[in-house]
């Protein structure tokens, strides 16, 4: 979850609502980690099963705005959390909630997207959810495309409800299809 200055106010509040919606759709057998980032990435909820949704939502709604945007470091910290518990029996995915305006650390769409592709080759998929008026479409779409995930944009959390549901349906159907093989 991007908590940088460019996400301050409404975009960050919408990102938190979006994250809470994701949690509401998860089951107790699912795993979740939450990473926030501005100029630094912080794992605010280490990877764990989704057993106490109320406690997870408390963590989500305690997120406050910060400084500049090291999107690369935030995404990478999220991917590392996924990798720690990667399993061939599960779908391993990073969901990035951001306006995509990287202005600190690695900012090259080409470099970041290439790394998304490398992780996809290792079975960790990246999907991006853009929020806010100044959404960096090029970076977010490129990350999702090379990361073999989906890319969506919305001004509000409500705008992203259908895409989130679509993503969850895709995950459930993909997992069920893989079980049949």
Predicted feature locations:
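Exposed acidic/Ser/Thr-rich ligand/metal-binding surfaces
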Residues: 1-180
């Amino acid at each position: 979850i991007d908590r940088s200055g460019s996400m301050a106010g409404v975009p960050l509040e919408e990102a938190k609502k979006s994250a809470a919606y994701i949690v509401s759709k998860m089951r107790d057998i699912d795993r979740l980690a939450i990473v926030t980032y501005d100029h630094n990435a912080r794992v605010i909820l280490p990877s764990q099963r989704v057993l106490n949704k109320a406690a997870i939502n408390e963590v989500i709604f305690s997120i406050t705005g910060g400084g500049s945007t090291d999107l690369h470091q935030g995404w990478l910290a999220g991917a590392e959390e996924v990798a720690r518990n990667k399993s061939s029996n599960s779908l391993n995915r990073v969901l990035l909630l951001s306006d995509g305006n990287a202005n600190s650390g690695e900012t090259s769409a080409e470099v970041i997207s290439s790394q998304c592709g490398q992780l996809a080759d290792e079975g960790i998929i990246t999907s991006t959810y853009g929020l806010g008026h100044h959404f960096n479409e090029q970076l977010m779409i490129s990350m999702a495309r090379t990361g073999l995930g989906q890319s969506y944009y919305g001004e509000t959390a409500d705008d992203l409800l259908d895409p989130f549901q679509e993503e969850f349906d895709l995950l459930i159907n993909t997992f069920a299809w893989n079980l049949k093989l």
